[in-house]
Each structure stands twice: as C-alpha cells, then as structure tokens.
C-alpha cells in the first residue's frame, strides 16, 4: 500500500537528527547474541542503522578486521581503494575502517580531494589497477587491488552501509561475504584480536596514499563513451545527483569533454530535506521511483523543461540511475534498458566482435 504522503515534500518531522545518528554510531554497542544486531551481508554488503544498533562502530571495526584477514589469506597484496557516499554514517565508518586497515598493515588509497566517491569509481580504480599491460584483466598474482565502499545505496538517511569489492571490482560473491560476516561476528563478541590505531595517526601513515579518483575516472570515460556524438547532437542534458556522491563529477566531465550537462540540484544535505517522500512514507533517494523523483518532475513541469531535452538522476553512491522525459515523467528502467540492449546488439557497435 502506498503511503498517504508519498510524493509529497519532506517535512521537518521526516528529517533525521544528524548528531543523534552519528552519536549513536559511537556510543551504542551491539549485542552479538541478538540476531538483529549481528553482522549480516546482503547483496551489497552490511547495512543497518545506528538507531537500531545494526550499524555501529563495533560492526565496522569487526568487519574491517575480517576483511584485512580475508585479503591476507586470499593473497591480495596490492592497495585497497576506499570510498564513501554522502550518508551521515558514511564518513564515521570510513574513518573507522582506515584505523583498522592501517593497523593491519594494509596499503589504503583514499580520495586526494577528500571528496565523496561513487561506487562505480571505486570499481573502475580496482579494475584499471589490476589490468595487465596487454589490456587483459588479472585476477590472480602479486600486487592486485581490492576495495571498500561505505554506502547504503539509495536507502534512507538513517542508514549506513559497508561493502567489500574483491579483485574483480564488483560485489563480493556469497562465499566471500559469508566468510567475512562469520569472522566479523566472532570478533564482535571479543575485540582482543582486533588491530586498530587512532585516525589522526592512521591518516598520516605512509600506508595511506592519496589518489585522485575523480580525475582517474573521468579521464577513462572517453574509452567507452563517444563524446563527439553527444556534443554534435546538441541535446540539452540535466542531471540530479539527488544529493549523492556524483555531484562533483559532472562539472569535471563538462570541463574535460566540452559538455554542457547542467547539475539541477547540486546541494549535499545528509537529511535530504529537499526530497519528496517515497512510496512507503520514508525519504529514499531512489532515482527510479516516481515518488522520490516527484519534486524534480514537478520543477521540470513548471517551466524547467525549457532548458532540457532529457534529465537523469543518480542515487547516493551513483550506481543506480533514472531518466525523466518531457510529457512522461520517470521512465521505467526495464523499458529503456531493453531499448539500449536492442540498440547495442543490433549492429550499432561496429567495433564489437560477432560473438559479443
């Protein structure tokens, strides 16, 4: 059933208390004997809320220690790329992870601009690092990299998320996440085997390296996107990052490729006070939801379409997108993805081999 306030602007009563959410991250200690308070990996890592004692400092300490132990057993000897999105709990968890990783002797690469990092950007950093000189991907051998993304994706502002990307650059398979979760839950009840140093010490360590995620990612886009076609088309594009990690990537794309993509709402607000309410009565930054996107659609229908031919949206970690069209609104993702697939496999990619 759709909530009565679905699609309506968020009110003060809908907003989180950021100080409370962060405070409980540090102050509340989970009980490993309570199932709801244990580490549990889903399809995209461990998720929860500090307000429900399901995403607290102890969880991240235990998970990160388990990851450090796992990558050592798996022979992953290269750097670990770590990024975070714009949720209130993401920066505290990011700091906690760095404390544990450095204490375990893991070489960590963080954003040189101290900026938010989309999930695809961390994946691309891992894949390019692990690429051989002949262009093939390496999944075994010395010096391979892996990563962590601190994000609960498009979930509400109260939530936190923490996911591990192995050397393949994508989500870890079930056998890996199960092993990490099992070890993390062992540690959750006994921190004697956890290594950790204060953040101020960790971030100054030689093990922490600054890496320009944004420049590295944007520079690689020309290898997969024909920007000449976009420029010559004259199409007027807008993008709404929905207060997420992609917000500062679009201006660099404009600068580097001479584009004119307009960032519709560039603000970052951990309460997401500018959102409209999703179908279940919660604030949720889902660019494929017509309820969550109604604020954007309404502003476009009230005259902003004069500036755009097409507008897109991305969720907080920018691995989910939505498309808004004039006289239609939010498109069904399955519909336009089907059209894209038909186009790509219909002979429009001459560089692709027949067996692709």
Model feature map: region roles:
Residues 2-103, 128, 207-237, 245:
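An N-terminal, well-structured beta->alpha segment
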Residues 2-15, 75-168:
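Ferredoxin-reductase
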Residues 12-15, 20, 24-27, 107-123, ...:
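Phosphate-binding chemistry for phosphorylated carbohydrates and sugar-nucleotides
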Residues 33-43, 195-198, 263-269:
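Flexible hinge/switch segments at interdomain interfaces of large molecular machines
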Residues 64-68, 100, 146-147, 161, ...:
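Glycine-centered structural positions embedded in regular secondary structure
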Residues 191-195, 255:
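Accessory alpha-helical/coil subdomains and C-terminal extensions
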């Amino acid at each position: 059933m759709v909530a009565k306030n679905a699609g309506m602007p968020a009110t003060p009563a809908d907003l989180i208390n950021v100080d409370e959410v962060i405070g409980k991250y540090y102050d509340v200690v989970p009980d490993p004997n309570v199932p709801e308070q244990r580490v549990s990996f889903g399809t995209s890592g461990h998720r929860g809320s500090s307000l429900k004692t399901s995403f607290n400092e102890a969880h991240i300490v235990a998970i990160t220690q388990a990851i450090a132990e796992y990558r050592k057993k798996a022979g992953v000897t290269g750097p670990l790329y770590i990024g975070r999105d714009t949720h209130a709990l993401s920066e505290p968890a990011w700091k906690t992870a760095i404390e544990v990783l450095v204490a375990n002797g893991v070489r960590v690469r963080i954003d040189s601009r101290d900026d938010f990092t989309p999930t695809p950007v961390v994946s691309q950093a891992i894949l390019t690092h692990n690429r051989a000189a002949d262009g093939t991907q390496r999944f075994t051998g010395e010096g391979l990299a892996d990563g962590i993304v601190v994000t609960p994706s498009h979930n509400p502002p109260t939530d936190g998320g923490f996911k591990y990307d192995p050397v393949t650059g994508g989500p870890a398979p079930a056998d890996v996440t199960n092993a990490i979760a099992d070890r993390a839950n062992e540690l959750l009840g006994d921190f004697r085997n956890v290594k950790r140093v204060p953040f101020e010490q960790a971030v100054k360590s030689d093990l922490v390296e600054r890496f320009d995620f944004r420049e590295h990612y944007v520079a690689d886009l020309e290898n997969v996107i024909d920007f000449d076609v976009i420029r010559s088309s004259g199409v007027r594009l807008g993008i709404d990052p929905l207060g997420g990690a992609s917000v500062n990537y679009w201006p660099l794309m404009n600068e580097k490729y001479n584009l004119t993509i307009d960032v519709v709402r560039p603000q970052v607000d951990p309460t997401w006070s500018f959102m409209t309410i999703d179908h279940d009565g919660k604030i949720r930054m889902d660019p494929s939801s017509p309820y969550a996107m109604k604020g954007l659609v309404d502003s476009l229908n009230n005259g902003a379409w004069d500036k755009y031919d097409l507008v897109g949206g991305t969720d907080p970690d920018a691995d989910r997108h939505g498309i808004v069209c004039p006289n239609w609104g939010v498109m069904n993702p399955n519909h336009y993805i089907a059209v894209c697939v038909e186009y790509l496999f219909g002979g429009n990619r001459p560089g692709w081999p027949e067996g692709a």
